[in-house]
């Protein structure tokens, strides 16, 4: 059962560059807070997978995560702004939610990024979501804080 959980964790955001962060290749997993929710608990939100990592980053790690996220943004559904929200400052992302191309029929994939500047580090949260929820649904459910 434990191996199955590890396997699901590794494949939820398979094929995405930010998977390097989730796998602990950018910063040690012991330095991150991670949560993975799957199944019926997400049914009210029309989601199947919600995978989140939160980490404290220095300038170098922030730049790496930002670059990986930007690479994944190239896989969004279209070039118009209807499938994403993006807020950036000084060339770095501070908030983003992006709908990616569908991985399976009638299943949407989303990546989210939030970076809060602290006194001597950056508080970064990355989220991967998968399910039938539309971007409009997610905007209602997870209002930007």
PLM features per residue range, with description:
Residues 75-142:
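Surface-exposed, polar helix/loop patches in the mature regions of secreted/periplasmic/lumenal proteins
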Residues 9, 31, 112-115:
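Generic recognition of cysteine residues
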């Amino acid at each position: 059962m434990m191996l199955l959980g590890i396997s699901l964790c590794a494949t939820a955001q398979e094929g995405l560059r930010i998977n390097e962060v989730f796998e602990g290749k950018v910063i040690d997993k012991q330095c991150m807070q991670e949560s993975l929710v799957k199944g019926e608990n997400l049914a009210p939100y029309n989601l199947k997978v919600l995978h989140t990592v939160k980490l404290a980053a220095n300038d170098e790690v922030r730049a790496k995560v930002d670059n990986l996220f930007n690479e994944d943004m190239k896989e969004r559904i279209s070039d118009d702004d209807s499938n994403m929200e993006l807020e950036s400052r000084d060339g770095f992302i501070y908030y983003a939610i992006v709908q990616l191309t569908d991985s399976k029929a009638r299943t949407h994939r989303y990546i989210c990024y939030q970076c809060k500047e602290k006194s001597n580090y950056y508080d970064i949260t990355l989220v991967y979501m998968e399910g039938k929820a539309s971007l409009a649904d997610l905007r209602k459910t997870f209002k930007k804080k």
